[in-house]
A protein has these predicted regions:
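Glycine-centered flexibility motif
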Residues: 1-2, 42, 100, 132
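Catalytic core of membrane glycerolipid acyltransferases/transacylases, capturing the structured
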Residues: 2-58
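Non-catalytic C-terminal accessory region of glycerolipid acyltransferases
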Residues: 62-175
Length: 175
């Protein structure tokens, strides 16, 4: 019920599709404006009303934060990758989360849903050939009451740790 922010680890171009395919209700996402103008990506962004963030424009970044926070507070669901990018063939390694990514959650006072993506990088961002099974794990939401007194870096660390723990748990279970 209501809006919330989804914060997954970022593995590659397939991530948004994997999440949107498995998510039970409509949602949108925030992405780098420069990468949003390629064929099909532009149309997909327009279709789901994604927000295009200019990474080198702090003023526009504040505008996007405010717009998304307002929409989330009004009930919309958004995906934002706090790593800010991904590496080719990343082998399920989670990079540092950018603390500023969590300003939207704080501003909207919405729940945070950590998402652990596993093997998503293999679809478009590796040399893997053949069928691939990817995993999307929606972790227990973190309610505003749980993080309201925390700094954005503390929230980023909390979400990252939960995602890393889930990935480790799943990797051990599938050995």
């Amino acid at each position: 019920q209501g809006g919330y922010m989804m914060y997954p680890n970022h593995q590659g171009k397939y991530d948004v599709l994997g999440i949107m395919y498995t998510h039970k209700s409509p949602c949108s996402f925030v992405m780098d404006k420069r990468k949003s103008h390629t064929i099909l990506v532009r149309e997909f962004c327009d279709l789901v009303q994604a927000k295009r963030l200019e990474k080198d424009n702090p003023r526009q970044g504040i505008t996007i934060i405010n717009q998304v926070a307002k929409e989330v507070a009004a009930g919309k669901k958004y995906i934002l990758f706090p790593e800010g990018g991904y590496r080719f063939n990343n082998k399920n390694k989670v990079c540092d989360f950018k603390a500023g990514s969590f300003k939207i959650a704080l501003k909207s006072r919405a729940p945070i849903v950590p998402i652990a993506l596993i093997d998503s990088y293999k679809v478009f961002n590796s040399f893997h050939i053949g069928p691939i099974t990817t995993y999307v794990h929606y972790l227990k939401p973190i309610c505003y009451e749980e993080y309201k007194g925390m700094k954005t870096q503390e929230i980023a660390d909390l979400v990252k740790i939960r995602i890393e723990e889930k990935i480790q748990q799943e990797m051990q279970a599938h050995k």
